[in-house]
Amino acid sequence: MQKYEKLEKIGEGTYGTVFKAKNRETHEIVALKRVRLDDDDEGVPSSALREICLLKELKHKNIVRLHDVLHSDKKLTLVFEFCDQDLKKYFDSCNGDLDPEIVKSFLFQLLKGLGFCHSRNVLHRDLKPQNLLINRNGELKLADFGLARAFGIPVRCYSAEVVTLWYRPPDVLFGAKLYSTSIDMWSAGCIFAELANAGRPLFPGNDVDDQLKRIFRLLGTPTEEQWPSMTKLPDYKPYPMYPATTSLVNVVPKLNATGRDLLQNLLKCNPVQRISAEEALQHPYFSDFCPP
């Protein structure tokens, strides 16, 4: 740890405390994540270390770079590139108004980062505005990629803050254990709607039951035809047959028709029907978009 000088505490992450720090040799500013591990007597599980070391190979401009892994007596510190703010803070500063071109640019960058990781079979599993970071140049980067696989998706942050369900797809809420890239695509859809509404969450549920009700009230309760395997999921229980909202115009009033079409393709209750990151990048919504 002598290599880095701690400057200030940034906050509490899902897995531990985050500090802003400086590399004493290069003077580069970095973010240090001290990972708290439950079974202190065991130290760091070797499976977690293997996973984390794989993440050092994920090099993409829309993924927060993992520079270094410091492992000493039962402590694990991850050294990440530093970004100025997360999307949640960004929303707070934009006063309920977000330029449609910025919405498009942020979604494009989110999908680029997802597509890159998915092509390498790395899932995020816990995407939310708090782990989408934005730097001074308006570049969006995905943070905490792959950590859910290494450490498990926590039920609550160790700071006792409950981990949000707002971005979890219906299959996961029904207890699906086999995750695929589709879990991240649902979260991307929720974040897209939140971008379009300048920071208003789409499905701010209080618990699993409330979360599923909010989803089905908007998208319609899936039928056996639409989602044949739904009733076989471990925590499945029937819900009232809510009809689908005919149009998303009132839900995302500032989003144009092609944007609404893309959103509908991301928010499919049946994970098999959800569009992939690569497919989403080819969607007409981006036809007039010039990446910077």
Curated annotation (Swiss-Prot):
A GO CC annotation given for this chain: presynapse
Active site feature: 126 (proton acceptor)
Superkingdom to which the source organism belongs: Eukaryota
Gene Ontology molecular functions: acetylcholine receptor activator activity; ATP binding; cyclin-dependent protein serine/threonine kinase activity; ErbB-2 class receptor binding; ErbB-3 class receptor binding; Hsp90 protein binding; kinase activity; p53 binding
Coiled coil regions, renumbered to chain: none
GO biological process: actin cytoskeleton organization; axon extension; axonogenesis; behavioral response to cocaine; calcium ion import; cell division; cell-matrix adhesion; cellular response to amyloid-beta
EC number: 2.7.11.1
Modification Phosphothreonine, positions: 17
Name of the protein in its database record: Cyclin-dependent kinase 5
Organism: Homo sapiens (Human)
Gene name of this polypeptide: CDK5
